[in-house]
Structure formats: C-alpha cells, structure tokens
Amino acid sequence: MLNNNLIIDISIDNLMEKVKKISGWQRYSGSDEELEAFKYLKNILDNIGYETKLIMHDAYISIPISSTLYVGGVQIYSQTHSMSPSTISSGIEAYGLYVGDFKNDIEEGTLNGKIAVIEGRAGFEQVDKAYTSGAIGVVFISDGVIRESIVSNAWGSPTQYTKKFIPKIPVVSVTNESGEKIKDTLQKNIVIINMATTVDTRWTKIPS
C-alpha cells in the first residue's frame, strides 16, 4: 500500500514545482545540467523510500550547434539537425536544385555535385536518396516552423550494422516562408547555395 504521507503529497502544485525545477536546466545529453537534473530526481525518489542507482554509460550523442545558409548570396535563416555531418567552417558550395518532395525518381546524374532542395520535414530516407543520387548537401523546406529532429535511422548508439543509417551529407531546414523564396529564386536563375553546419557528435558518458 502507498504511504499515507505520500498520498497527501500528490498534488498539481507539487508536480508543477518539480516540473519547473527540471525545466530550468538545459538538459543536453552529456552536459553537467543533465546530470544535475538526474541527481535532483534521484534525491526525490530516495526521500520517498525508493532504492535508486545513478549510473553513467557510454552513448553516441549528437547536438546541433549552428548552421548558415546563403542562396544566391542572400543569407536565409536555417537550422541543422542531430546526426547531420559538420562541414568545414567555410561550408560547402554548389548549385541548388529543387526536387519537390523527392518521392519520384529523377534522371541519373541530375543531382551530381549539387545541393538538393526538398519539400517536407528532414528525414533519413530523403537525405540518403539525395546522397545516393550524387548530392553533396540537402536543404529541407519545412511545412511551417522548423522542427527539431534527428536525421538518422540508427536508433540508439550505432552498431557496425546500423551505422549505415547515419547521413553522410550535411542537412539544414528552413521555414516554409523562406522555402518559397528559395524555390522562386531557383526557378528564375541558376543559383549557388552555400551551407555550413556545426554538429557536436561524439561518444560520451550520460546518466541513466
């Protein structure tokens, strides 16, 4: 049976107090603040009477840091994604090619050495298809706002069998509004796109 004092402590105010405390930390994987949040929760559970153990284990983490995007020399706000490769500081540069939602096949060689501009939310399948079609980078046009997402299909830390599901070319996303401007520019001219990504991807210790 539940301890009567524990039942008394169950309340919306008590819950929101804990949520507010936890949300005050930026809990990036492998960060000191993530560890502090874990210790805070462990202490709460210990005080209730649970036996808990905080362990540190190796994990392959990926945190998007920054991206820049220039289309025809005009800077456009963009965001990169977890598991996107980082570029060199000066970025990559190539002609852009709009391929719609990229569900249909395109003529072989059409994307060779180009940066693909694709409709929809960033995902591994479209990135991998662009890569195998010869693209060196991908710009996704989001349906609305840019969603935080991971562009890998290797769930959890990759193994020798799943590492092939991690993208090999850099990826950024733009808003739908910016995407319409990019499409208009590409339809009128042959345009150079420059994109740079910085993503902190590495093995590190994280709590659990």
Regions found by a protein language model. Give the residues of each.
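Alpha-helical metal-binding/catalytic segments enriched in His/Glu/Asp
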Residues: 45-46, 120-121, 208
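Soluble metallo-hydrolase cores and metallopeptidase-like ectodomains found primarily
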Residues: 76-108, 158-208
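Noncatalytic luminal/extracellular "stalk/propeptide" segments of secretory-pathway proteins
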Residues: 2-13, 17-115
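Alpha-helical scaffold elements within enzyme catalytic domains, especially in hydrolases
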Residues: 21, 43-44, 129-132, 185
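BRCT (BRCA1 C-terminal) domain core and associated BRCT-interaction motifs
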Residues: 62-64, 69, 139, 145-154, ...
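Solvent-exposed loop/turn segments at secondary-structure junctions
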Residues: 29-30, 58-60, 103, 121-124, ...
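Hydrophobic/aromatic beta-strand patches that form the interior of the parallel beta-sheet core
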Residues: 53, 137-139, 172
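A conserved hydrophobic secondary-structure block that centers on an alpha-helix together
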Residues: 102-145, 149
